[in-house]
Curated annotation (Swiss-Prot):
The organism's taxonomic lineage, starting at the top: Bacteria, Pseudomonadati, Pseudomonadota, Betaproteobacteria, Burkholderiales
Keywords: Cytoplasm, Heme biosynthesis, Metal-binding, Oxidoreductase, Porphyrin biosynthesis
Species of the source: Bordetella parapertussis (strain 12822 / ATCC BAA-587 / NCTC 13253)
GO cellular component assignments: cytoplasm
Biological pathway: Porphyrin-containing compound metabolism; protoporphyrin-IX biosynthesis; protoporphyrinogen-IX from coproporphyrinogen-III (O2 route): step 1/1
Compartments reported by the entry: Cytoplasm
Catalysed reactions listed for this entry: coproporphyrinogen III + O2 + 2 H(+) = protoporphyrinogen IX + 2 CO2 + 2 H2O
GO molecular function: coproporphyrinogen oxidase activity; metal ion binding; protein homodimerization activity
Name this protein carries in UniProt: Oxygen-dependent coproporphyrinogen-III oxidase
Cofactor: a divalent metal cation
Amino acid sequence: MTAVAIPAVRDYLTDLQGRIVAALEQAGGEAFRTDAWQRAEGGGGVSRLLEGGQLFERAGVLFSHVKGTRLPPSASAHRPELAGRGWEAMGVSMVLHPRNPYVPTTHMNVRMFVAAARPGHAESDVFWFGGGLDLTPYYPFEDDARHFHRACRDALDPHGADYYPRYKQWCDEYFFLKHRNETRGIGGIFFDDLNDPGFDASFALTRSVGDSFLPAYLPIVQARRDMPYGERERDFQAYRRGRYVEFNLVFDRGTLFGLQSGGRTESILLSMPPLAQWRYDWQPQAGTPEAALAEFLRPREWV
């Protein structure tokens, strides 16, 4: 496989979505809704979602394969030579917002983008892969952070020992709220614009990232899901979820691309938490579990 094999990527992504949803349904004992949709400009997708669950207060596992005739500005900003080309984008993107504040929120995304060669021009299709997974705890545990990062490292090491440290640093830098001077969570891995190893190797690495999600996250869910909590923890969870909203609406490239490309708003904003709150200049009391989170919201080596 040397050309851009769009059907193979699509088959992998739809299978990944199905496997993840099946595992989450088994863990939570609640069924996800299925919402298939079409995009007038080209393409469509399938959204699998759950709202008001006992384990997951809001969860979305989304597949999309969309097309357009001209690259939107967010996609061509780093590649101005591709401006004006037709394009295809496909991926699986997911965000899970658990109900129990001791279970962390998580995000995972794997995707491929293709800028098509223009008829009559001496050029070829240009592809690149991207993705990653990251963890956003409210009441963090070092064991959870180390487990999550070990799973990320183990996914990437077969493709080269330099990938994990590079993509870990990229994640720390990407999921950073500049106006708050803090990371969104404890990181994970993040990559974009991957095509230099060639199509086969780039696709293989992306599959490893997607396949690593369940072993990275589900053991943490099982370890924390039955921890008792009360109004104090739920209140702090809602406050910290506000940071998630701030990042997604101000900095996230995927959100910006979706909105600029005329994407499906319901799918794009499914990453938002169901409840969030803001307070003016609130600071947790020193020595409390809430104050301990600040020590985790800065880049550090976990493995």
